[in-house]
């Protein structure tokens, strides 16, 4: 045995299992600007100290394994290991802690959300020492952000492309989501766009099924877009869902959309995967297409308060991977979304810089430097009576998307679109005049009903509709 091999195998190495906290719990550690920081909500198994649980998370999501290995001596663990550097008990919860973990930047491949998540959340969530584990937030350092392209275009470029300023954009998901032929689908798209909407949308599970193949849908929707544009003088779009079973097929659909000259395509970024999403985002930037992102399957990951991953992390990941719009809840509709928490990750999507604010669920100050912003999309169980609240909550840089709230109008699709456009214009005008949308919202809508019979009919249909359930996503 050579002296070199003898040194590796014997010096400083003792086989066996040792406590994680001896190596990975480092409360004296001063975080670096280049570290990726994570806030985990940790629920240890009975008898497991929080320091050991936090250290276990740091170890298993970086360089650690269940036993001491002699190859530890072949590298610098201090350079590459994750560190649990701070632990806070969760107020009002028994045996639950927020454990803060710092990861050296060298652990992650440049420009890869896939690799970042594989490391940080890929394996540790099944760890037996933990009863539950939730990733609440990430601080992405500027040095890592600059390795990503981010959104294909961003908010300002989109407004310039569409020539639409000073108000939220209006959309509609075509219903029924499945079962329509391509021609009938295109008819519904035309009627909604002709009535005053900016966008219509494929539902997330509309891909290329036997009743409506993707190429037929793309052709009829393009015809609807051009006809509506010619008649209204406004730029229109339809989110053509390019999501497919393979990346190659997805790109083929995006290429066809570009050849048709439409402005925007769509992707289901969680079910489709981050690698596919980043590839599509790169194609969209190179070819002038906007990219709408649907978050189908997000609630499987983020709905439970104690286990999984908060949507603010998925939102940050999307801003890195690339998308110009993303669904973000409504606060007021049928889908989950507590107001302050929702506004917290809406700001993370749009703003260049967000301060740490635990009251809104923001655990870290985050700078996005020159990364373009993403438009949040409010959709799910909303209708004209919600328009004042949505306009006040989300502001101009948003997309307000009414599916049933457009197509469910008693007079048809086009009058439903008219009702939504009139309600939005009335709310924007009232806001610009200094009126309080939160206090006077219903009055503003009723006043607009006097000169819009379409809006009056919509208000009558949905006057009693409410979705009042306790939000599970709380601080």
From Swiss-Prot:
This is Ribulose bisphosphate carboxylase large chain. GO terms for cellular component: chloroplast. It holds the Pfam family RuBisCO_large_N. The modification N6,N6,N6-trimethyllysine is found at residue 14. The active site is at 175 (proton acceptor), 294 (proton acceptor). The record marks 334 as: Transition state stabilizer. Its main location: plastid. The modification N6-carboxylysine is found at residue 201. Heterohexadecamer of 8 large chains and 8 small chains; disulfide-linked. The disulfide link is formed within the large subunit homodimers. It comes from Stellaria media. It catalyses: 2 (2R)-3-phosphoglycerate + 2 H(+) = D-ribulose 1,5-bisphosphate + CO2 + H2O; D-ribulose 1,5-bisphosphate + O2 = 2-phosphoglycolate + (2R)-3-phosphoglycerate + 2 H(+). It is an enzyme of class 4 (lyase). Its cofactor is Mg(2+). Coiled coil: none annotated. Substrate binds at residues 123, 173, 177, 295, 327, 379. InterPro entries: RuBisCO, RuBisCo_large_chain_AS, RuBisCO_lsu_C, RuBisCO_lsu_C_sf, RuBisCO_lsu_fd_N, RuBisCO_lsu_N_sf, RuBisCO_lsuI. The basic functional RuBisCO is composed of a large chain homodimer in a 'head-to-tail' conformation. In form I RuBisCO this homodimer is arranged in a barrel-like tetramer with the small subunits forming a tetrameric 'cap' on each end of the 'barrel'. The modification N-acetylproline is found at residue 3. Mg(2+) binds at residues 201, 203-204. The keyword Cytoplasm does not apply. The disulfide bond which can form in the large chain dimeric partners within the hexadecamer appears to be associated with oxidative stress and protein turnover.
